[in-house]
Amino acid sequence: IDKSKPIVYLLPTNSVTDQLALRMSTKALGLPSPTETLTLAGREYSSTLFLRKTQPLFRSSAKDTGIEDVFTDLFHLHRDHENLDLQVVPVYVTWGRAPGRGKPGLSDLIADKAAPSWLRKLFIVLFLGRDNFINYSKAVSARAMSNQHGSDQSIAHKLVRVASTHFQRKRQSMTGPTLLERQELNNSVLGSDAVRRAIAEESRSKKVSHEKAKETAQTYITEIAADYREGLIRFGDRLLTRIWNKIYNGISVGHADRIRELAANGHEIIYVPCHRSHMDYLLLTYVIYHEGMVTPHIAAGINLNFWPVGKMFRRGGAFFLRRSFAGNKLYTAVFREYLELLFNKGYSVKYYPEGGRSRTGRLIPPKTGMLAMTIQAMLKGVNRPVSIVPVYIGYENVMEVKSYLNELKGSKKKKESNLQVFSAIRKLKNYGHGYVNFGEPIALNQFLENHVPNWRDCRDAEPEKKPAWLTPAVNELANNVMTRINRAAALNGMALASLCLLSSKRQTMSEAELKQAMGDFMDLFKAVPFSDDATIPDSSAEELLRDTLKLGRFDVKEDDYGRLISPQPKSAVYLTYYRNNILHLFAIPGLIMASIFAKKGTTKNSIFQLIAALYPLLQKELFLHLTQDEALAHTDALITALLNKGLLRQESDELLPPDAHCKQFHSAWLLSRCMQETLQRYAVVLTILDKEKVISRSALERESKQVAERLSALYGLSSPEFYDKNVLSSFISALKENHWLDSEKDGSLKYSEECEALRADVMALIWPEMMQHLENVTLNASN
C-alpha cells in the first residue's frame, strides 16, 4: 500500500462494527481513516466502499449498494485525469473462525457468515469480540485497471465479481470448509467403494460376518478421525499466547506470504514440516492461525492418543495413525479414504515426512507413506490444485534434547504419558527464540506433469493397482520436500555458538573469539546466501551472543584477560543437536577451508575437484538443494567472499589460510574443523572397505559402528550421531547410488579403484592422529 496515493477501502458488507474495527486498525498502522471523505479531481467520495449491505432482519435479501456505478464513475475519472491513481484495498474483517456445520445449531448464531443481520452481528461481537482479525489484501491500482481494460461499466462489473470471489476465498482460507457431521463422515468413508471392497475382503480372509468386519472398519474410523472444534482453537490460542510469552523471546516467521497467496488462489494446502519436538504440533498451528489461515488437520502418531491429551489434540484437528499399516488392508483402506475425504472437502492437512522426531538435529530420511497416499488421492481426482508446503522449524532450546541423546546411547524410548506432559510443563523456562520458515511450495499437479506426463491416464485404472511410476515419483517428491525444508533453514544464536564451540579444540573460547567467529560467519552468509529462503538474524554478533548466553547452556568464567565460554559440565553433547540444525549450511565452506588448512594451501581447481567428488555424498546425507554445477558455482562465489572477508588470502594461484596474527584466523580455523566429524565418519567406512575389499552391507554397517564408537571414546567426540547406524547407512547408500562401490552377485559390496581415489581425498582432510588411529584400529580388527 502506497500511502502517498489516494486509498479507498473495499469491504464485503457495510457492517458498522467492521468499520469501527477497521478505523482502529488503520490508525494503528498510520493509514488514512476509512471514515474520512476522499477528494478526487474536485469530487468527494467515501473512503470505504461495500459489495453489499447487511442482511435485513425481516427480509430474505439485502439491498444493492450501487457499487458498480461508483466504480464506473471512478474509472471515468481516471480516463479524464491521467495523473490520478486510486488504490483499491480489499479488507476482510472477521469475528471468530467458526466454519459452520452441515447441520445448523445454536453455535451458528455466532458464526460470522456473509452479511449477517445487525442482530446476529450483535451476538457475534458480544461473544467473539476478542477474536477479531483484519486482513488487508494487496492494493489494486485503478489506473492500471483503467489503462488495461478501459473504463466502461463492464469493467466495474468484473471488478465487483472478482472482489466477491476474493472475499469468499479469503473466508475459506480463514475458516475452512463446513465441518462434517460424524454420521456424514462415517457414511462417506465406510460407503466408499474401496472400503466396501476391503470390508468384504476382511470378512472372507478372517472368516467373520460382514457386520463384524464393518464394525471393525467403524472402530478404525473412530480411532483415526479428528473432531475439530473451533472453540478449542480459540481457547488454545489464548493459552499458547501466555505460554509462548513465558518461554520464548519471540517467534520469527519467514515467507508466510506464500501460504496466504496459495489460499487466495484456492489451493489445497498440505504442510510438510521437519519434526524437532512435540512442540511442533502447537507452534506451527499457532503460527498458521496468527497468519490468518485456517488451522490444518494434523497427522499425529497413535502414541499421542492418550487421555486427556488425545481428546484435546483430536478436537484441535489431529487425526491419528499407526506406526505401521503393514498387513492390515482394511485399516489402510479406511485411513486412505479418510485422507482423500479431507483433500476433497478442502481441509488443509499437515503431516511430518520424517515420520518421527529427529534425535540428532539433522533431517531424517523421509518415510514416504503419506506422500504416496497424497499422490494416490490425486489419481482419484482432487478438484482443486494441490500444493505441498515444506516448513523449517527451529528452536534455540528443545525440551526433549536430553531424552533424545539418551535414546541414541541405547536407552529405551519412554512411552508418552500424562506424567511426561506434567513434567514438561513444570520444566517450562527460557527457550529462546522459535523459528518457522515456509519453504518454496511444490505444485503437485505440475510436479506430476514434469515427472509423469501421462499420470492422468491412471485415473481409470483399478484403484488398488499401483502404477509402476508411483514409487520413483514418490521418492523424488520426498527428496524434493526434504531439500526445500533445509533450503529454508534459520540461522540462530544457539546453533551458531554450538557449532563454533564444538569446532574448537577444547570446546572453550574467549568471548571475543566467539563473538568474532559468529559475526564472520553471519557476514559470509549475507555475502553469499545459502539460498533465497534461508534466514539470518538481524541482530549483531554481540547481541546474538548475549541472548544465547541467557539460555543457560554455557558456563562463563572470567579471569584477568576476559571471559571464557564453554558448555556446561557434561552438556557439550547437547550442543551437537543445535549444531546439526544448521550443519548443512556449512558443508561447502567447511570443505573449502578444511582442504586449505589440511594442505597448508591449495589451488582453486583442486578445491573444485574435491567438491565435485564429495558433494554428491554430502548432498544425500544433508539434503542439499544445489545441483552439482550449482554447487561448483556456489564454491566459486564462497571463495571470493572468503577472500574479501579476510578468511582466506591468495598468493599467485595458491589459496592460503589467513595470517596467524589476523583477527579472522581463528574464525577460518573453526570453519576448517566444522565438518571434521562427517569426514572422519566417511574415513571409517572407506578404510574398512579398503581393508576388506569385499564385504556384506550388514557387516560393513556393524564394523563401521564399532570402529566409530571406539574412535569416539579415544577422542572424546561429543556427537552420538558419529556412530549412529542410520547416518552410517545413509552414507553407504550414497556410495552405492553414486557408483563408488560395485556389487557382487550375492549382494556384497566391492571396493573399487574410484573408491580408492575418494578415500585418498577424505584421508587427506582428517586429523593426522585420527588417521593413524583409524589405520591401527582396522588393522588390529583384521588380525
Predicted regions and their residues:
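Membrane-interfacial terminal anchoring regions of lipid-handling membrane enzymes
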Residues: 1-783
